[in-house]
Curated annotation (Swiss-Prot):
<dbReference type="GO" id="GO:0008784">
    <property type="term" value="F:alanine racemase activity"/>
</dbReference>
<dbReference type="InterPro" id="IPR029066">
    <property type="entry name" value="PLP-binding_barrel"/>
</dbReference>
<dbReference type="InterPro" id="IPR009006">
    <property type="entry name" value="Ala_racemase/Decarboxylase_C"/>
</dbReference>
<feature type="active site" description="Proton acceptor; specific for L-alanine">
    <location>
        <position position="265"/>
    </location>
</feature>
<comment type="pathway">
    <text>Amino-acid biosynthesis; D-alanine biosynthesis; D-alanine from L-alanine: step 1/1.</text>
</comment>
<comment type="function">
    <text>Catalyzes the interconversion of L-alanine and D-alanine. May also act on other amino acids.</text>
</comment>
<feature type="active site" description="Proton acceptor; specific for D-alanine">
    <location>
        <position position="39"/>
    </location>
</feature>
<protein>
    <recommendedName>
        <fullName>Alanine racemase 1</fullName>
        <ecNumber>5.1.1.1</ecNumber>
    </recommendedName>
</protein>
<comment type="similarity">
    <text>Belongs to the alanine racemase family.</text>
</comment>
<dbReference type="InterPro" id="IPR020622">
    <property type="entry name" value="Ala_racemase_pyridoxalP-BS"/>
</dbReference>
<dbReference type="GO" id="GO:0009252">
    <property type="term" value="P:peptidoglycan biosynthetic process"/>
</dbReference>
<keyword id="KW-0413">Isomerase</keyword>
<dbReference type="GO" id="GO:0005829">
    <property type="term" value="C:cytosol"/>
</dbReference>
<dbReference type="InterPro" id="IPR001608">
    <property type="entry name" value="Ala_racemase_N"/>
</dbReference>
<feature type="binding site">
    <location>
        <position position="312"/>
    </location>
    <ligand>
        <name>substrate</name>
    </ligand>
</feature>
<feature type="binding site">
    <location>
        <position position="138"/>
    </location>
    <ligand>
        <name>substrate</name>
    </ligand>
</feature>
<dbReference type="Pfam" id="PF00842">
    <property type="entry name" value="Ala_racemase_C"/>
</dbReference>
Length: 382
């Protein structure tokens, strides 16, 4: 990855904010391992730089969704434990062993297939975390008998290590009894067998709202980056999280639309009076979606409307006359009260803050801020 970039749109990522949020969870759960979830490119922030900074601040365990994500971390010097939360094709089992990556066991059948695919030349250990489906209805084992049988199979092989067991809450960010029911179901199943080194069930919402003394690890994701899983969670907790992302574009051109002139595809905006517009070199290919037409961005402290359709690579904004090329524009801000907060963008897009962040594409340079230090990552120039 290069430390150069040649475009006027980029992300600012506050690594100190991420480290502060990590410390929040370490303080809330002092006797538990914090498995920092850095899947989906660390929710859009950049998994390598985030994981490296978290390791420097005490992280010892990461969770990702795919083996590819785990290998990316290994290739860039991340030596901490890594768990793949998704399902690895059984034929690729040796690659996980080679890179010392723990895997999720979603079913007895998967385990049997995985064992068949371990080459005779492999002598390294394979760490396994069994996934229990306690109500999410996705991956995992639903009954105690099968869970016990899977453990028995693992114990037959010296190379296999039953390292963990976990489940995932479906409604931890909402009011209701389902999360408590899932937690008790999880405890009941785990208590019917030998206990592994790691027992974990709390996502960001669960980690903020629940104690879960039965568990000895937590898996915060979105909240590591400074964002609450829902408004309900934000209102229920007194924990202060620090948002870590800004999305910035610099004006590349200004011009005046005369009355009757239109702008962008479909000519959906037509000026009624002489109107100054600014062109921003960012669009839906960067994760700033077409639905953001009609929203507002911060131009030199002025709230300015996005007019016309957002294009693949460009966005048009109605601005004061004094705005000029080179001026900085905030499209997403790292202040929760800002009109450009991630939550405001999520509401405009009829989605959740997770998706807004994950949509920020890899073609955007990431500028990382660590105190007075500044680092640039451009994944297009490797």
């Amino acid at each position: 990855m290069s430390d150069k970039y040649y475009r006027s749109a980029y992300m600012n990522v506050d690594l100190n904010a991420v480290a502060s949020n990590f410390k929040v969870f370490s303080t809330l759960h002092p006797n538990k391992t914090v498995m920092a979830v850095v899947k989906a490119n660390a929710y859009g922030l950049g998994s390598v730089k985030v994981a490296r900074h978290l390791m420097e601040n005490g992280a010892t365990f990461f969770a990702v969704a795919t083996l590819d994500e785990a290998i990316e971390l290994r290739m860039h010097g991340i030596t901490a434990k890594i768990l793949v939360l998704g399902v690895l094709p059984a034929k690729d089992i040796d690659k996980a062993i080679q890179h010392r990556v723990a895997l999720t066991v979603p079913s007895k059948q998967w385990l049997k297939e995985a064992i068949k695919n371990i080459s005779g030349e492999q002598e390294k250990k394979l760490w396994l975390h069994i996934k229990l489906d306690t109500g999410m209805g996705r991956l995992g084992i639903k009954d105690t008998k099968t869970y016990q049988e899977v453990i028995e199979i693992i114990q037959q092989y010296e190379q296999l290590v039953f390292e963990g067991v976990f489940t995932h809450f479906a409604c931890a960010d909402e009011p209701g009894d389902m999360t408590t029911e899932q937690y008790h179901r999880f405890k009941d199943m785990v208590n019917e067998a030998i206990k592994p080194e790691y027992i974990h069930c709390q996502n960001s919402a669960g980690s903020l709202l629940m104690d879960c003394q039965f568990c000895n690890a937590i898996r915060p994701g979105i909240s590591l980056y400074g964002y609450y899983p829902s408004e309900y969670v934000q209102q229920k907790v007194k924990v202060h999280l620090k948002p870590s992302v800004q999305l910035i574009a610099n004006v590349v051109q200004t011009k005046t639309l005369q009355a009757g002139e239109s702008v962008s595809y479909g000519a959906t905006y037509t000026a009624t009076d002489p109107t100054t517009i600014a062109l921003l070199p960012i669009g839906y290919a960067d994760g700033y979606l077409r639905i953001m037409q009609g929203s507002f961005v911060n131009v030199n402290g002025h709230q300015c409307e996005v007019i016309g359709r957002v294009c693949m690579d460009q966005t048009i904004v109605k601005v004061p006359d004094q705005v000029k090329a080179g001026d900085s524009v905030i499209l997403i801000d790292n202040h929760r009260e800002s009109p450009q907060s991630v939550e405001v963008a999520a509401e405009k897009q009829h989605t959740i803050n997770y998706e807004v962040l994950c949509n920020l594409s890899r073609r955007l340079p990431r500028i990382y801020h660590d105190g007075d230090q500044r680092f640039v990552t451009n994944e297009l120039l490797k």
